[in-house]
C-alpha cells in the first residue's frame, strides 16, 4: 500500500471512530467522502441493487463461503460505497485468501460515477418508477444516466427486469451483455392502470398489455415493431 492509500485509509478510520465513539453515529458516508478526496483508487467487483435485494444477494454469496463486502447500511452514493470498501479493509487482511465478492447498493444517478470505478461483474436493474421526480427529474434522464454508466463499464453484464419496459429499453440500447428476469404469468394481483411507460422505446407506438402486475410492470408487446 502506497503512502497516499495509507493516508486515505487512516483518515477514514479516524473519521469513522469519531462518528461512532463521539457523535454516536454510524459514519458510513463521511469516511468515504474523506477517503475519496485523498485516494480514489479503491476498486472492487460488485453487484448493484436496492437495499433488500443487495442484502439478500450478499447473504446468498456469504452462504457459499465467499468473503462479502457490502454497504448494508444503505449508504448508496459514491462516498458510501467507498466507505464500505474501507470498512472491509481490515477484515480482508485477516481472512484466508479465497473468493471475495463485492455487493453494493447504488443510487440510480450515482451509477455513472460508481460503475466505471468498480467495474462490477454484474449490474442488477430492478425497476424504474417516478417516485422521486423532485430529485431525479424526468424518468428519461434517469434512463440516460444508467445507460451511460453501462457504456462506461462495457465488461459488466446487465441483469434487468424484463417485465419493466423502462428497464428493457435500457438493455436494448447498451452494448453490454444482458440477462433478463421476470414473472412468467399473471399473479392475480393485476392492476388496471399503467403508470409510467405507455410507448415503445423503439418506434414510440403505444404498448399493448396482456396484463399489468404493478405500475408499468407486466406482459406487454409493441403492435408495430
Task: Describe the residue ranges of each PLM region.
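Cys/His-rich short segments
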Residues: 184-225
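Phosphate-binding loop of NTP-binding sites
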Residues: 3-182, 189-202
Amino acid at each position: 500500500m502506497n503512502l497516499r492509500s495509507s493516508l486515505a485509509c487512516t483518515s477514514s478510520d479516524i473519521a469513522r471512530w469519531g462518528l461512532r465513539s463521539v457523535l454516536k453515529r454510524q459514519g458510513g458516508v463521511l469516511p468515504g467522502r474523506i477517503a475519496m478526496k485523498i485516494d480514489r483508487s479503491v476498486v472492487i467487483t460488485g453487484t448493484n441493487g436496492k437495499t433488500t435485494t443487495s442484502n439478500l444477494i450478499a447473504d446468498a454469496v456469504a452462504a457459499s463461503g465467499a468473503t462479502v463486502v457490502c454497504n448494508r447500511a444503505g449508504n448508496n452514493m459514491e462516498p458510501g460505497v467507498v466507505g464500505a470498501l474501507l470498512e472491509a479493509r481490515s477484515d480482508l487482511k485477516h481472512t484466508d485468501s479465497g473468493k471475495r465478492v463485492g455487493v453494493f447498493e447504488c443510487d440510480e444517478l450515482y451509477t455513472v460515477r460508481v460503475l466505471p470505478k468498480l467495474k462490477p461483474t454484474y449490474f442488477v436493474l430492478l425497476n424504474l418508477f417516478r417516485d422521486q421526480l423532485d430529485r431525479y427529474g424526468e424518468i428519461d434522464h434517469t434512463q440516460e444516466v444508467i445507460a451511460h454508466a453501462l457504456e462506461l463499464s462495457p465488461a459488466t453484464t446487465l441483469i434487468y427486469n424484463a417485465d419493466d419496459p423502462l428497464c428493457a429499453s435500457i438493455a436494448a440500447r447498451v452494448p453490454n451483455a444482458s440477462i433478463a428476469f421476470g414473472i412468467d404469468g399473471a399473479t392475480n394481483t393485476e392492476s388496471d392502470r399503467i403508470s409510467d411507460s405507455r410507448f415503445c422505446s423503439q418506434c414510440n407506438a403505444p404498448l399493448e398489455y396482456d396484463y399489468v402486475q404493478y405500475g408499468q410492470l407486466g406482459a406487454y408487446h409493441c403492435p408495430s415493431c
